[in-house]
Amino acid sequence: MPNDPDQDRPREEILISPRYLAASLPTDHQLLLDIFVEETAWSAHTGASTLTVTSPCRRIAIRHDQTAVGRGPHMVISARTDEEAAERWRAEISGLVPIECVAGLLGTLAGELATDPDHVVYGIGAEPGLLELYVDPDSWAHFDDFGLSGFISRDGHAAVVNRPVDSSAPPIHGDASVTWHLAASPEDVGHLWDISFTEKTPPLLLHAVAAETLDPRPTLRSTSFPLPGVVAPLVTIERLPPPSTRPTAQPSQGGPPRRPEPKRTPKTR
């Protein structure tokens, strides 16, 4: 059988900014989860429209439900002290979340669970509720009002929001256990994506997603993961030359910008 010409075509790399609008399709989230299973010792169970991935210790489960797309969270990560115990913490992914956020979350979860499972499941060794983030004040503004705190992008399209469990603010999504919420909702598009974390989620998991979202640099992505057309008018895309044509001695003028020196913001509880 002849080779598929699409398989022989080299994939391009592109820079997308701002990175919080570099949306990805839920089907790509499932593809990423498939790759995750292939590269780890986690087990997978496939249903008619679902993919459930379970850690070797059976205490962490990741469920992707294609039928939930557009109606609520289509990927849910949950932790229990054992298979029969009540849920200890939960992370929910809805909409066109940038695949880099999903990859960072899965990679951090798997790596930390392999080295320090009690930290992931029980929070042992972590300072509860403490998260230190570094942001570019030219790209994000800090706020602390009406029982909520966090950061909002200067264009108003995205936010990272903290709601303590004892806050007077209304519960996020009607769930008082949700303490962190990251979302993008451009005015011309409406709800684009969101990720929420409940109270006992290990801070390092939130940090992996928040740091990716707040990073002011463009995101580097392969065209293997296409950008949904709905956000095309809202982002800037720069196509990079193939690796064989890129200079090796010095970076090109149009290459990825250097990471700016991080600027410290107050610790947020």
Residues of each region from the PLM?
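Compositionally biased accessory segments in Actinobacterial proteins
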Residues: 1-269
